[in-house]
Amino acid sequence: MNEKNIKHSQNFITSKHNIDKIMTNIRLNEHDNIFEIGSGKGHFTLELVQRCNFVTAIEIDHKLCKTTENKLVDHDNFQVLNKDILQFKFPKNQSYKIFGNIPYNISTDIIRKIVFDSIADEIYLIVEYGFAKRLLNTKRSFALFLMAEVDISILSMVPREYFHPKPKVNSSLIRLNRKKSRISHKDKQKYNYFVMKWVNKEYKKIFTKNQFNNSLKHAGIDDLNNISFEQFLSLFNSYKLFNK
């Protein structure tokens, strides 16, 4: 995505009072190394450097990079990189967390990038509230792919009045906690196939009628419109047993 389009999609939070309210929901300590996605004008970056060991801010807008550096002139535990987060290569040999107030229009791309291309153990993001709810919806393929790798929580609402320019909708702070992948490497392709057939309701392509009924019963599913991720995993495991 080019710099111009990202600029037009950015909404900033600059009030220290509002930033402090958001920061109370983020678990950080003086040993943490943080990658910040989009430093903006440096308001969150300033709070992060005061709480953490080291902050690497990744900002595509070179003018905002300078603004952030100027705001943090009294600190030395940070760096600002003028890069596109979607092209950035996260380190594979160190422990870190990620924070970002990310653009609405590339939220899916950013989350896919940081879940599957980074090893961050905790990820905190400010995203549009409706989008956050969709990440918890087991009828959506993207949610099912994410849930296999991370636990997803909505931590708090972030009212639209916190931002400037003010967006049309409210946002929320979410946390993605890394866990041991629920899908083995050898089953990834099979899981991807199962997810896509399931969300498209192509049940006959993954189960016979008897297999389907038995799998639902084993998973304790009474309503196909209301299933947990654990129940979905039970269905997938049944599918694997039937297709050895």
From Swiss-Prot:
Enzyme Commission number(s) from the entry: 2.1.1.184
GO CC term (a single one): cytosol
Binding of S-adenosyl-L-methionine, residues: 11, 13, 38, 59, 84, 101
Keywords: Antibiotic resistance, Methyltransferase, Plasmid, RNA-binding, S-adenosyl-L-methionine, Transferase
Top EC category: transferase
Reactions catalysed: adenosine(2085) in 23S rRNA + 2 S-adenosyl-L-methionine = N(6)-dimethyladenosine(2085) in 23S rRNA + 2 S-adenosyl-L-homocysteine + 2 H(+)
SUPFAM superfamilies assigned to the protein according to its UniProt record, in alphabetical order: S-adenosyl-L-methionine-dependent methyltransferases
Family matches, as CDD domains: AdoMet_MTases
Annotated GO biological process: response to antibiotic
Annotated Pfam families: RrnaAD (PF00398)
Cited InterPro entries: KsgA/Erm, rRNA_Ade_diMease-like_C, rRNA_Ade_Mease_Trfase_CS, rRNA_Ade_methylase_Trfase_N, SAM-dependent_MTases_sf
Any GO MF annotation of the entry: rRNA (adenine-N6,N6-)-dimethyltransferase activity
Function description: This protein produces a dimethylation of the adenine residue at position 2085 in 23S rRNA, resulting in reduced affinity between ribosomes and macrolide-lincosamide-streptogramin B antibiotics.
Family statement drawn from the similarity comment of this UniProt entry: Belongs to the class I-like SAM-binding methyltransferase superfamily. rRNA adenine N(6)-methyltransferase family.
Name of protein: rRNA adenine N-6-methyltransferase
Organism this protein belongs to: Staphylococcus epidermidis
